[in-house]
């Protein structure tokens, strides 16, 4: 698993799934951050250059990689690279959905830039945490059934 560590609210849940299934997990960010002392967990600190964490993640995506990110452009890159991508709210991004999600994200950014939309995403809640855990468990189970 690869985690885009910037503002990831489900790290604790990821670590539990990592231990349950014995999955090597990389937590990637452009600055130092604390991590639990776990053999399966590896901290990756990249340069502070724009998108360097995203670039590292995409370079290390494999067919059976699960990437957790709330960054829609990164999710699109992961899907194109053949990885499985989940948001912290449990949304699965795949080839059939990522184009629409990316277009909607770009539209909302444009509207916000023009001052036409002032809303922001709703706060992260317990329901999101539960949906994420279910989606992550399902993704791991699917990959295991496929022989990974």
UniProtKB/Swiss-Prot annotation:
Intrachain S-S bonds: none
Family classification: Belongs to the UPF0178 family.
Alphabetized HAMAP family for the sequence: UPF0178
PANTHER family the record matches: UPF0178 PROTEIN YAII (PTHR35146:SF1)
Official protein name in the record: UPF0178 protein BH16190
Organism, scientific name: Bartonella henselae (strain ATCC 49882 / DSM 28221 / CCUG 30454 / Houston 1) (Rochalimaea henselae)
